Amino acid sequence: MKAEYNFIANIIEKNSTVLDVGCDDGTLMEFLKKNKNVNIRGIEISKEKVQICIAKGLTVIEGNAEFDLKQFPKNSFDYVVLGQTLQAFINPEIVIKELLRVGKKAIVTIPNFGNWKVRLDLLFKGTMPITSSLPHEWYNTPNIHMCTIKDFVRFSETINFKIVKS
């Protein structure tokens, strides 16, 4: 279980409604359903991952959040979760604004490209690091926007996205 799942679970209240955007194989959805008794839905771009989720009995639709969040009504969820995915969107600003429209609260986690281990790897090895949160080679990564925590804070201020907990 990823450490970030516990962080997310500690924020989400029991019996709430949740949309997991980029839900991957549904691991977080299962965790929240079991431990928080939430009514949870997912949206995932990968057809294979959607099939895995459905096989687990989870409610997931195949779609791209950059375009498909528009189909959800305003404030239709208590929480909208976007875990480790923001950097893969062409226009992260649109995605954040849609998260805030669809959910009463948004929970966003990002890989910190400024993490000291990442920087040390780059400094001493001279190559882009491969870690558990950054598992791809530079030429085969879905990440198109690399940012640090400070970059994300500045971005949030620019689009009036208030960070409550970090």
Regions found by a protein language model. Give the residues of each.
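Conserved alpha-helix/loop element of class I SAM-dependent methyltransferases that forms part
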Residues: 1-15
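Alpha-helix C-terminal capping/helix-to-coil transition sites in glycosyltransferase folds
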Residues: 14, 75-76, 102
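Class I SAM-dependent methyltransferase "Motif I" SAM/SAH-binding loop
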Residues: 22-24
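Class I SAM-dependent methyltransferase SAM/SAH-binding core
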Residues: 27, 31-68
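Short conserved loop adjoining the S-adenosyl-L-methionine
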Residues: 68-74
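A short SAM/SAH-binding and catalytic strip from SAM-dependent methyltransferases
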Residues: 79-91
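S-adenosyl-L-methionine-dependent methyltransferase catalytic module, highlighting the catalytic core
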Residues: 93-101, 105-166
